[in-house]
Amino acid sequence: MIKWGLFGAVKPFRSMVPLSQTRSLIISKSSLVRSKRVSTIRPQLAPVNPYSKIYGRRFFSSSHKLGVNTKEDSSTYLFGRKISTSESKMLKSLLVTIWPKNKPSFKLRVIFALSLLIASKLLNVEVPFFFKKIIDEMNVDWNDQLGTVGTVIGTLIIAYGGARFGAVLFGELRNAVFASVAQTAIKRVAHNTFVHLLNMDLNFHLSRQTGGLTRAIDRGTKGISYVLNAMVFHIIPISFEISMVCGILIYNYGLSFAAVTLATMLSYSVFTIKTTAWRTGFRRQANNADNQAATVALDSLLNYESVKYFNNEGFQASKYNTALTNYQNASVKVATSLAYLNAGQNFIFTSALTAMMYMGCNGVATGSLTVGDLVLINQLVFQLSVPLSFLGSVYRELKQSLLDMENLFQLQNHEIKIKDASNAKPLLLNSTGVPGEIKFENVTFGYHPDRPILQNASFTIPAGEKIAIVGPSGSGKSTILRLIFRFYDVESGKIFIDGQDISKVTVESLRRSIGIVPQDTPLFNDTILENIRYGRLDATDKEIHEMIDKVQLTKLIEDSPNGVNTIVGERGMMISGGEKQRLAIARLLLKRAPITLFDEATSALDTHTEQSLLRTIRKVLTKKANTHIAIAHRLRTIADADKIIVLNKGQVQEEGTHHNLLQNPNSLYSQLWNIQENLDIDEELNEYAKETEEQK
């Protein structure tokens, strides 16, 4: 009986036993792309001084690029105090988003919104003056001047109502005009962060907490919206309104009223700033606990089957409850400290209002002030309560939003390790002959400095040949595929494709030339059709159906209620492992890449389906004289390869054809083959029996 390998027909060399009897002896290996493991190590963030304050002198440099570290140590001030470097960079970055270069229409919209805001504040300050005049005009003899007084008062009432309505109208128009500005800024930052995350290396994503990342982005974008509105439409306008009120009080009523007002502003601001700085630590604790809770929940749901396999629902619920308890405790501290802040602010303002009312009543009693003046002073000071209370709210919410934005901008500050060199050029494959020669020259690489995976590995994969890479677990097989695909850069040595150093070609052109079937096939929560189309986005439905037939997915399509439009579930959990691998192979064939990599591409298939699919793959690959590399533990599937490279301890121990390697009975390949061919099965079973007996 003829067996089929990945690259062609293979005749049996000796008596073979069913794979089911020897599968337990096949040496296992790590997958090319593992399911993401949640790291318990929180990303190290730049320290934020909890006592840094906000309220403004030196402002922003328009040359600052979004999310880019700068070496300048220029200080930024807000609310009269120096804020931290990280907060300064965030504020500068936000200014760029609302005042972008080469977008005059965008700038005009910002200017128009600011104009509406100023008009709203001017009308708002006029309202108490109309009220004062109405009161004073009422204090006359109506019998002598009924018509005149009625006309004047009627006009003042209309003006009063018009000013109040106009202030509200201009304020709402301002919000409408600025809405697109804020949303555009949010979209830009979120998009840039997402693109930056996609450009990060594989190691970054394998070591990060997915739930924490998504929550940080969500809170960060909301924080951007608040900061933009607070900075542009509240801090400056509130300062403008307070200045106008103080000026009016000094001009009309002397320094005493203005002194009380200024003392109130100062006391209010100092109390708010100090208390908010104290509360910042509680908010940061709440954010960290919130991130941890989101991470635990997401990790538990992504690993739903593992939770069920080991009956650990209670354990996961306990972990989630612990994270929620930490968040609850931190949130209680946030709420109680907020109550203290609000009570203190109200006490300061109420004391000031009481003092000014006493001074005003005393003026009326002595005849130096009219009743209208008393009303005006009361209205002006009381009117300040809204922006003043909002000023405190703005400060504490601004600090909170900056904390929420902190992780978002820290993500953008992570260095992209795998990127194009300054002089990178597109990969040019051999156009005159067969493309895809791959050469490793003294390559050394390890995921950790103290544990190298490859050590001075050198070998050549000829163009157009079918190469298999085998070896014990941890010998570096999957690492080679990752390095070819440039998920990582080598520590030393070089990798060439058609004579070009892959570190000096563009990453996009390199990966466009390579197709891969990973052992763990990640799929999108989309239809079968769209998951296959992901291999080549411009592929037609007809081409996709051809690939479905070639990889024998027709039965799955026929049995599915929605056919090719069946949703495969998150990461493909709603279809079997074998179906996922066939779908991945269909996606690879659709890509038409000149270099193809197979990492245990048929490990989840039964023997019959595997043999049938291998024949199909061989036919497709034979038509294209390209380079094909396969990693396998089932040595029968790669025995027909043009060359087999045997790795051991990070180095090439031997290489050759299947026949040549078997001629040396002491070769590592022969040992692996003999184990799988059951020649040593009795010895293995005896050792297993002894170990079992010892354990008893």
From Swiss-Prot:
Transit peptide per record: 1-67
UniProt xrefs under CDD domains: ABC_6TM_ATM1_ABCB7
Compartment(s) where it occurs, according to its Swiss-Prot or TrEMBL record: Mitochondrion inner membrane
E.C. designation(s): 7.-.-.-
PROSITE patterns with a match to the protein in the record: ABC_TM1F, ABC_TRANSPORTER_1, ABC_TRANSPORTER_2
Keywords, comma-separated and alphabetical: ATP-binding, Membrane, Mitochondrion, Mitochondrion inner membrane, Nucleotide-binding, Transit peptide, Translocase, Transmembrane, Transmembrane helix, Transport
Residues binding glutathione, per UniProt: 279-283, 342-345, 392
Membrane topology note: Multi-pass membrane protein
PANTHER family: ATP-BINDING CASSETTE SUB-FAMILY B, IRON-SULFUR CLUSTERS TRANSPORTER ABCB7, MITOCHONDRIAL
Binding partners and assembly: Homodimer.
Family membership: Belongs to the ABC transporter superfamily. ABCB family. Heavy Metal importer (TC 3.A.1.210) subfamily.
Protein name, as recorded: Iron-sulfur clusters transporter ATM1, mitochondrial
Lineage: Eukaryota, Fungi, Dikarya, Ascomycota, Saccharomycotina
